[in-house]
Amino acid sequence: MLNSLDLEGRPQDTRIVVAMSGGVDSSTTAALLKSEGYDVVGITLQLYDHGAAIHRKGACCAGQDIHDARAVADRIGIPHYVLDYESRFQESVIDSFAASYATGETPVPCIECNRSIKFRDLLSTARELGASALATGHYVSSRRLADGSRALVCASDADRDQSYFLFATTRDQLDYLRFPLGDMTKPQTRELARKFGLSVADKHDSQDICFVPTGRYTDVVGRLKPNAMEPGEIVDLDGRVLGKHQGIVHFTVGQRRGLGIASTAPLYVLRLEPSTRRVVVGPREALRMDRIVLRDVNWIGDSSLDRAVGDGLELFVRVRSTRRPQPAWLRAQDGGYQVELVAGEDGVSPGQACVFYDAPAGQARVLGGGFIKSATPRAAGKSALRGAPASRPQVADARG
């Protein structure tokens, strides 16, 4: 007989490790599972030097968060452990974040953290503790398939859905993970937290990248990759120099204000060229991209990726965490994979994720995804656009 987590055995005989960040979502997850009788163990990861982030609203994984997680564990009566993952986090997430920015990409550190820290290292720790599953407070769901494996699906609350950040989850990891909040709304979660008497019931949501509590990611990039702060030229699509800048890291795709150049028509940042330290600007229509070349593709759909793609697979993709999935085609191309967007997208950026879905709305199944290597217009009007990687938008919402 299966319990509420779709696992064999009675809840009291089933150990569940909960990843507790100190926020209301993971805290409610732990309290909910404890109330259902599970043998719950809470684990909080210390990921970075958190002193500067203490007590700051909108920052996660900070010193105050560790205190809050411990207080919740004491309240609901579960063991709680803090694991020092600072060196792993520095190498796997922070260093790669800075390196990605220095090459003109816009990384999504939450994806890398989930992939290499939470769902690899922490999951291994949970298994070592004899847990039957690792539960998190993500707003996403999973369901059992006919063969016993699990599918990743969007949360019922589309405005809270975090599936974009979890596309890199492997099949093996997905079978071990559980997401108890997948069918809840945020207000319902907070109401449960109040019911359980949790001190974090009204705690602010995390909004910044956790290791950038000030919101100024350029401080991190500048410290680790000073070359990203070197001055360069601002040029138009024909290569004409329009002005100077003080580092490509200060610019984002679609940016119009603060360019420091005069023009009779509106100009937008189109892309960054780190090798020449150039910022390329142009008209708004030049922002639209239609073809995306992917790297590091992860497939969690049925069968193998190559068999599923065949001569072309019609699906839906999301190239920003805040956008709804849009129609696209996934094709094999030159030993890799390429996505063709039916309607196109403004500001597609290398380093961001392109996530695959089987439907445009509702609790769609996540089929996988990849990181964007480059993007081009379907029919570039300027030779300067052909084959050139697109530039980057604002850092994606880091909640997750």
UniProtKB/Swiss-Prot annotation:
Active site: 113, 210
Positions contributing to ATP binding: 19-26, 45, 137
EC code: 2.8.1.13
Site location (Interaction with tRNA): 138, 352
Top-level enzyme category: transferase
UniProt GO molecular function: ATP binding; tRNA binding; tRNA-uridine 2-sulfurtransferase activity
A single GO cellular-component term on record: cytoplasm
Cross-referenced NCBIfam families: PRK00143.1, trmU
Name of the featured protein: tRNA-specific 2-thiouridylase MnmA
